[in-house]
């Protein structure tokens, strides 16, 4: 029978509930337990797919094509269990499901209310999400409840968790509360009152936390922990200090050293083997002791909010671990390149253009592509970054001066990149779309396997085929591919059913390392294994730095 750990947050948002939940999962997995995680989001949006990156940050895409919260990316990076659509749900999905049932008559004419109908539906979604785990029936399901205790949006989720813990009985569920202990510089001390009030708020709705994770910019002294314990009615050894760390991969060891996994296992009556965190220690050791260094420029329009590129940043960090290289990322606003030129790129060892949507800043990204191609600087284009590389090549090499994407210019006569109107989903069903289709849930989403052209750089990196995740509406237009190939561009991978270009590259006679991919490889990178594409990219950046005579 699956046991549940509910993770809540207090005082302020963005304390790191996702990292805390993922770190606990990593420790429990190292003890031989099968673990899955769920994220419950209190917003009314059905999913984050149409939300602004400035509002929500990155949209993480699962293997089965769900657009989910970025915390699911942390979950996959910390444990071996893969996430699915059922691992993340929102208030919007809950109400949508309940209203659909009401319209069908499932409630037999009863008045539909938050309690019991909404809370029952939340519990059903939680149990369904746990049961869908790719690891089989999990021993433990860790359920992260988004938002902050006291928010009206979170109340139905907290009530559902309370009811569920009561229904499951003792030793089947426990609560971990993450809260802030701020340091007040003028007083020169940490203040525990916000944590006391947060726990009181939780107790008012019937939830008694078993563990407090106290976030601070420094380790919390024992006397402050005793005070928190006394006022919150939580045992002193269960008041755990979580201070700022320079790497999230240090958090599992930090929590284990303070006995978090022991407390959870005792509360849930689990008797697994001892934790083995040697892998995490080895990763941190490599991360902190690089042998060389490179600087990679990430050219985008969301650079003021790096959460928009969370998985990409982590993928580069994983590559740094597996190449013993410190990777410095410089965030470059593509709109500034449009006005100030590309001089700010000249010191870079490599250029990366990530995915994105909309016309704003695209000409600046194209300028970055042109600079990388002409200067023989390693270039990696992801999703939109590949499309813009093709547009730049079409304009400046092939001579199609009006080449563009219909996303930016619907009337362009040279539609090098255009809307996909028909494709097959993961189940082999034909999906169709037009310019008038809804934005939500109408992209090509999820994993798709495709063969790689022999003799290409793509084959050197991936092998015979590639299986990566997608999130896009537009594709390179096959009508222009013969002209692009005549100019030297190589389409190194295509989808097997629709023959859509998946990867492009330039031959080494034209450029040492120039690759574009239509998919999002960052979603499958993990600190354990890294990712072959990002590893190759960092190695190319190193080679470029050494070729320029700069000490790596």
Swiss-Prot record:
Protein name, UniProt field: CTP synthase
UniProt pathway: Pyrimidine metabolism; CTP biosynthesis via de novo pathway; CTP from UDP: step 2/2
Residues binding ATP, per UniProt: 14-19, 71
Catalytic residues in the record: 383 (nucleophile), 520, 522
Catalytic activity, as annotated: UTP + L-glutamine + ATP + H2O = CTP + L-glutamate + ADP + phosphate + 2 H(+); L-glutamine + H2O = L-glutamate + NH4(+); UTP + NH4(+) + ATP = CTP + ADP + phosphate + 2 H(+)
Residues reported in the UniProt entry to bind L-glutamine: 356, 384-387, 407, 473
Keyword Zinc: no
Database matches in InterPro entries: Class_I_gatase-like, CTP_synthase, CTP_synthase_N, GATASE, GATase1_CTP_Synthase, P-loop_NTPase
Enzyme Commission designation: 6.3.4.2
Gene3D superfamilies reported for this sequence: 3.40.50.880, P-loop containing nucleotide triphosphate hydrolases
Residues holding UTP: 13, 191-196, 227
Keyword Metal-binding: yes
GO molecular function, one term: ATP binding
Keywords assigned by UniProt, alphabetized: ATP-binding, Glutamine amidotransferase, Ligase, Magnesium, Metal-binding, Nucleotide-binding, Pyrimidine biosynthesis
Task of the protein: Catalyzes the ATP-dependent amination of UTP to CTP with either L-glutamine or ammonia as the source of nitrogen. Regulates intracellular CTP levels through interactions with the four ribonucleotide triphosphates.
Superkingdom assignment: Bacteria
């Amino acid at each position: 029978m699956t046991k549940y750990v509910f993770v809540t947050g207090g005082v302020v948002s963005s304390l790191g509930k996702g990292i805390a939940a993922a770190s606990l999962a990593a420790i429990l997995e190292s003890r031989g337990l099968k673990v899955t995680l769920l994220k419950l989001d209190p917003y009314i949006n059905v999913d984050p797919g149409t939300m602004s990156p400035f509002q929500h940050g990155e949209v993480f895409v699962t293997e089965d094509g769900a657009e989910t919260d970025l915390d699911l990316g942390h979950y996959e990076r910390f444990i071996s269990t893969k996430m699915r659509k059922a691992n993340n749900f929102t208030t919007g999905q809950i109400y949508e499901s309940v209203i659909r049932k009401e319209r069908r008559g499932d409630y037999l004419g009863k008045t539909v209310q938050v309690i019991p109908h909404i809370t029952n539906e939340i519990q059903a979604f939680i149990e369904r999400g746990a049961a869908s785990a790719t690891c089989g029936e999990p021993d433990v399901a860790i359920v992260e409840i988004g938002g902050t205790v006291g928010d009206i949006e979170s109340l139905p989720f907290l009530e559902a968790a309370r009811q569920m813990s009561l229904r499951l009985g003792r030793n089947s569920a426990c609560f971990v509360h993450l809260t802030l202990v701020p340091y007040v510089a003028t007083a020169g001390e940490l203040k525990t009152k916000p944590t006391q009030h947060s726990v009181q708020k939780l107790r008012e709705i019937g939830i008694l936390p078993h563990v407090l994770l106290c976030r601070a910019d420094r380790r919390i002294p024992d006397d402050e922990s005793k005070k928190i314990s006394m006022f919150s009615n939580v045992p002193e050894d269960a008041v755990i200090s979580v201070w700022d760390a320079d790497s999230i991969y240090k958090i599992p060891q930090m929590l284990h050293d303070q006995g978090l996994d022991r407390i959870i296992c005792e509360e849930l009556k689990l008797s697994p083997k001892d934790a083995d965190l040697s892998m995490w220690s080895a990763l941190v050791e490599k991360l902190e002791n690089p042998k060389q260094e490179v600087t990679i420029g990430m050219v985008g329009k969301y650079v003021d909010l790096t959460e928009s590129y969370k998985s990409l940043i982590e993928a580069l960090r994983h590559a740094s671990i597996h190449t013993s290289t410190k990777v410095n990322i410089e965030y470059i606003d593509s709109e500034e390149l449009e006005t100030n030129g590309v001089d700010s790129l000249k010191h870079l060892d490599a250029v990366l253009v990530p995915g994105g949507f909309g016309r704003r800043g695209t000409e600046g990204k194209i300028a970055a592509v042109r600079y990388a191609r002409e200067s023989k600087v390693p270039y990696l284009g992801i999703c939109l970054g590949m499309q813009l590389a093709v547009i730049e090549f079409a304009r400046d090499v092939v001579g199609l001066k009006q080449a563009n994407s219909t996303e930016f210019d619907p009337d362009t006569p040279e539609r090098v990149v255009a809307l996909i109107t028909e494709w097959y989903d993961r189940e082999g069903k034909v999906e169709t779309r037009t310019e008038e289709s809804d934005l939500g849930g109408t992209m090509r989403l999820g994993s798709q396997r495709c063969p790689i052209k022999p003799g290409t750089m793509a084959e050197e990196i991936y092998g015979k085929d590639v299986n990566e995740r997608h999130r896009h509406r537009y594709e390179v237009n096959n009508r222009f591919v013969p002209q692009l190939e005549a100019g030297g561009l190589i389409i190194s991978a295509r989808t097997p059913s629709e023959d859509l270009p998946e990867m492009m590259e330039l031959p080494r006679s034209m450029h040492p390392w120039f690759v574009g991919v239509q998919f999002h490889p960052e979603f499958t990178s993990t600190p354990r294994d890294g990712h072959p594409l990002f590893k190759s990219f960092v190695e190319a950046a190193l080679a470029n730095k050494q070729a320029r005579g700069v000490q790596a």
